[in-house]
């Protein structure tokens, strides 16, 4: 059973009490609504795995079971708040397009859908059975008819509710001050990102603004006067923590589709036409492709299949109209699947398995022979292996687009550059040895190639003012495909260039490759000739046959002075070439040797750092792909908001740095860019997944230390721990990972410091797995195939080491309390917090590491939250717990005695300093851009909010109040 990763528990979901509820009136009574604000995780001192923390609309905050001990205390009422949407579905009652939240489809009527609100308000025939879709990807769940079922009134923060500021309030005095009330006038979505996730509130002073009620898991409001929000059928809502199964798209022969699969449509035209109704539609031209081989390009949100037949033709098909074609032939490029256990199982009777084949897992190879039994001989990494066809998938080049493999883009451009340079060198040699009549029309080009300025001048003087049209001497006549001006410019013969310009030689005439004279000065690295041509009015942005400008050429060849001159003369630094690469893309591809050029280009005022090339890489993506640290810093300085921007496949800059082992780039993105280390791509992989997948041992500790979750799962339910044991279980740790990479040594030192015996003998996969287990990775976490890391650790020594590391983590989390793993524990975040699930008894506290000073000491117990995080010395000055932010009412030593707060230094001087510091911070906050948090506000919008000039120029709506920006006023502070 495959589970839909989008249907799992996420912060922001709106919930009501469920079938296993036993917590009295904590929710304010049956029908009360709350918001999931925190998820449990294995080993957490706050909440264990399969529990959640809920902030109820009426104010109480506590934890509940979402699969823990097999119980489900809550039901999911609405998931529009986490961005769930059915893009191509229209509610047939309220007619809203792009249905948000759960979808309810009638099983009796053809193509009839309702949104949650309409379904719960008894729209459509109550005797009809419906299907529930939690997401656009999940399998439908069949429901009984609504007729006769009890409906429960919904109460909470809805239109008309009376509210005050809530637990996540961070909006100053917008409400008029603590305790002031407001009235909810509307529940809406946050732009196009989420639905029904914010409330529009009008306060007592008449001001209106929007506040979070589920958006990003935050709740800015607390309900003091509930409003009715409709009804719900308790029996028809899904249990929170029980994700829906993934909807499988299958072909006509019952096999599930994947991107890159080879398919054919083998149906008659009439049958296909009927099937296409509601599945992409019918076009008569589709009949031309019946029986032709195509490639699955993508699966649409509705489950239809987008098939590409050639470079330009794509059609959308009903999945049942297609048949998969699984054959491979000699010459086909394939990829070996990466799951070690799966390959071992499939190889039985098909060439068998040997441990020497391990390096081929996940690699790309070519089919060199097809055996009679269907097995294939595949060349991978210089060796040949026999594989079962089930172990291979068709290679999709776009999969490697995020890998800096063999510097593909740079090699292609360098090869083209070398080709042009070589042909030009051959042409010059031919010109210099050419014996021609002195009156030959191309003689002027020969003299330019020989550098005979005097002879060229003599030829020009012989026909004054007629050189441009004299039959015996045409100044723009080509010889070997070049004009005299192009040759002179390439060789840097400035005097001859001036003479030819005086003779009205054309500056715009291209050669056979489309290069103008300015391209030739760039190819020849001739700064002075470039100046002369630009002063004479030469087109600075002329493009050749590959759509490259002279700036592209100069950048690709690394000619800094020419680049400077072109930029000074106002060339367009944003023009893309045939690959949609800008000059800065090319400079980044050139590596560290072009750092000075990167400096020059990024200082040009009009440069567009958001430019994207044909592979979907922005400049920040490209710099992260290539490991260009300087470029990353320069781009972040101009547009830090791009740090988490995603490509079409969901890859961010940090994904690319992690995938390609660019540790320093990752450090810059984390520390200077403040990127989201837990961001996930379309396959739900985090940067940690990719670093582990590629065995980049230096990046794994960096990402974990930066806060990357070790228990995040990808689309297959695999955590980083699963990946480590699947991909690199057989690779030796040091022998194969040496060569100047400090990563293995860093990771080894961390393992040795933990006291793990024999860690130097571990393989790469085992070492990474042990490190992750030490950092809290759940060794019992089951993926969608039901396999845990302990199941994948087939070797007894590795299994024992993994269990030992997990035990060390539990002991560390318990504060050295004898290694008893902590039970469910609640995060007490507000005065209204109640704890449902209590910690099992543990041994008395022993010396542990203080989270502030890192000294080993007896930790102080905070009340009411019951956290032990810091030593006595650090605890004296604390007002709030640093783990849960609850105000501390009492601080207790292990013996039960109370810690007295630090003595305040009396006297006006200290109070004055604190007051001035507070005022300074307030002033700084008022004038700092709320987007980049780096620059001062320079632009003010009509709503009163503002931003710095670079951020403000790119905005269409105010980031604070979401009002459209009609005017920008520049200020000086």
Curated annotation (Swiss-Prot):
The keyword Ion transport does not apply. Ubiquitinated. Possibly via autoubiquitination. Zn(2+) 2 binds at residues 106, 109, 124, 128. Highly expressed in brain, heart, liver and kidney. Keywords: Actin-binding, ANK repeat, Cytoplasm, Endosome, Metal-binding, Notch signaling pathway, Phosphoprotein, Repeat, Transferase, Ubl conjugation, Ubl conjugation pathway, Zinc, Zinc-finger. A zinc finger (ZZ-type) spans 86-138. A zinc finger (RING-type) spans 850-885, 929-962. Zn(2+) 1 binds at residues 91, 94, 115, 118. The keyword Repeat applies. Interacts with actin monomer. This is E3 ubiquitin-protein ligase MIB2. It comes from Mus musculus.
């Amino acid at each position: 059973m495959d589970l839909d990763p989008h249907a799992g528990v996420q912060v922001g979901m709106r919930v009501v009490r469920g079938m296993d509820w036993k917590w009295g009136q904590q929710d304010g009574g049956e029908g009360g609504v709350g918001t999931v604000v925190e998820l449990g995780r294995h080993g957490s001192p706050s909440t264990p795995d399969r529990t959640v923390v809920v902030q109820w609309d009426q104010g109480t905050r506590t934890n509940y079971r979402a699969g823990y001990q097999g119980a489900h205390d809550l039901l999911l009422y609405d998931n529009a708040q986490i961005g769930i949407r059915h893009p191509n579905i229209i509610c047939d009652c309220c007619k809203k397009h792009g249905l948000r939240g759960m979808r309810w489809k009638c099983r009796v009527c053809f193509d009839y859908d309702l949104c949650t609100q309409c379904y719960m308000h008894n729209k459509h025939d109550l005797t009809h059975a419906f299907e529930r879709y939690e997401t656009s990807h999940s399998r439908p769940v069949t429901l009984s008819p609504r007729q006769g079922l009890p409906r429960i009134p919904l109460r909470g923060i809805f239109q008309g509710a009376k509210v005050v500021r809530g637990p996540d309030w961070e909006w100053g005095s917008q409400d008029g001050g603590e305790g002031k009330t407001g009235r909810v006038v509307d529940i809406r979505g946050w732009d196009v990102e989420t639905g029904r996730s914010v409330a529009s509130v009008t306060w007592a002073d008449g001001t209106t603004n929007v506040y979070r009620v589920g958006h990003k898991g935050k709740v800015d409001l607390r309900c003091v006067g509930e409003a009715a929000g409709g009804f719900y059928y308790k029996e028809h809502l899904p249990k929170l923590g029980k994700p829906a199964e993934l909807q499988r798209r299958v072909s006509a022969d019952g096999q599930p589709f994947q991107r890159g699969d080879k398919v054919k449509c083998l149906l008659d035209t009439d049958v296909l036409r009927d099937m296409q109704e509601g599945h992409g539609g019918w076009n008569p031209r589709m009949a031309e492709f019946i029986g032709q081989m195509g490639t699955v390009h993508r699966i649409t949100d509705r489950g239809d299949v987008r098939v590409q037949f050639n470079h330009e033709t794509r059609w959308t098909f009903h999945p049942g109209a297609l048949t998969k074609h699984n054959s491979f032939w000699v010459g086909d490029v394939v990829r070996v699947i990466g799951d070690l256990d799966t390959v071992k199982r499939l190889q039985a009777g098909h060439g068998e398995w040997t441990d020497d084949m391990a390096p081929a897992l996940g690699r790309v190879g070519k089919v060199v022979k097809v055996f009679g039994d269907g097995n294939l001989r595949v060349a991978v990494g210089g060796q040949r292996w026999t594989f079962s066809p089930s172990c291979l998938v068709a290679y999709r080049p776009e999969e490697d687009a995020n890998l800096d493999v063999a510097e593909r883009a740079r090699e292609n451009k360098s090869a083209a550059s070398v080709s042009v340079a070589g042909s030009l060198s051959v042409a010059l040699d031919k010109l210099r040895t050419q014996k021609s009549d002195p009156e030959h029309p191309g003689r002027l080009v020969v003299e330019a190639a020989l550098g005979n300025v005097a002879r060229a001048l003599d030829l020009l003087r012989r026909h004054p003012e007629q050189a441009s049209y004299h039959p015996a001497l045409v100044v723009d006549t080509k010889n070997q495909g070049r004009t005299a001006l192009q040759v002179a410019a390439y060789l840097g013969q400035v005097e001859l260039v001036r003479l030819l310009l005086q003779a009205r030689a054309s500056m715009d005439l291209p050669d056979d490759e489309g290069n103008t004279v300015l391209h030739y000065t760039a190819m020849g690295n001739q700064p002075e000739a470039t100046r002369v041509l630009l002063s004479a009015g030469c087109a600075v942005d002329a493009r050749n046959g590959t759509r490259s400008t002279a700036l592209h050429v100069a950048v690709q060849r690394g000619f800094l002075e020419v680049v400077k001159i072109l930029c000074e003369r106002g060339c367009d630094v944003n023009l893309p070439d045939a690959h949609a690469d800008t000059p800065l893309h090319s400079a980044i591809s050139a590596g560290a040797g072009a750092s000075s050029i990167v400096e020059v280009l990024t200082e040009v005022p009009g440069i567009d750092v958001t430019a994207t090339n044909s592979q979907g890489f922005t400049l920040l993506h490209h710099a992260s792909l290539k490991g260009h640290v300087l470029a990353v810093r320069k781009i972040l300085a101009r547009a830090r908001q791009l740090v988490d921007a995603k490509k079409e496949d969901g890859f961010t800059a940090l994904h690319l740095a992690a995938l390609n082992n660019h540790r320093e780039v990752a450090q810059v993105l984390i520390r200077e860019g403040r990127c989201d280390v837990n961001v996930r791509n379309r396959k739900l992989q985090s940067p940690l997944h990719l670093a582990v997948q590629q065995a980049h041992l230096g990046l794994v500790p960096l990402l974990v230390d930066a806060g990357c979750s070790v228990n995040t799962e990808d689309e297959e339910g695999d955590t980083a721990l699963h990946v480590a044991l699947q991909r690199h279980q057989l690779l030796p740790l040091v022998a194969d990972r040496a060569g100047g990479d400090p990563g293995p040594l860093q990771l080894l030192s961390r393992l040795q410091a933990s006291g793990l015996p024999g860690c130097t003998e571990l393989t790469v996969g085992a070492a990474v797995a042990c490190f992750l287990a030490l950092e809290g990775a759940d060794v019992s976490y089951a993926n969608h195939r039901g396999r845990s890391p302990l199941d994948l650790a087939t070797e007894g020594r590795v299994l024992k080491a993994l269990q030992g590391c997990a035990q060390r983590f539990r002991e560390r989390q318990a504060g050295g309390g004898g290694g008893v793993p902590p039970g469910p524990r609640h995060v007490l975040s507000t005065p209204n917090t109640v704890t449902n699930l209590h910690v099992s008894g543990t041994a008395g506290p022993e010396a542990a590491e203080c989270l502030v000073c890192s000294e080993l000491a007896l930790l102080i117990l905070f009340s009411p939250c019951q956290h032990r995080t810091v030593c006595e010395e650090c605890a004296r000055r604390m007002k709030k717990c640093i783990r849960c932010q609850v105000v501390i009412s009492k601080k207790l030593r292990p013996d039960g005695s109370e810690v007295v707060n630090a003595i305040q230094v009396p006297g006006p001087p200290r109070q004055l300093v604190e007051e001035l510091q507070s005022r300074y911070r307030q002033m700084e906050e008022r004038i700092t851009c709320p987007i980049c948090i780096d620059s001062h506000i320079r632009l003010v919008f009509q709503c009163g909010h503002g931003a710095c000039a670079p951020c403000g120029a790119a905005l269409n709506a105010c980031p604070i109040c979401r009002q459209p920006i009609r005017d920008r006023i520049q200020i000086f502070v």
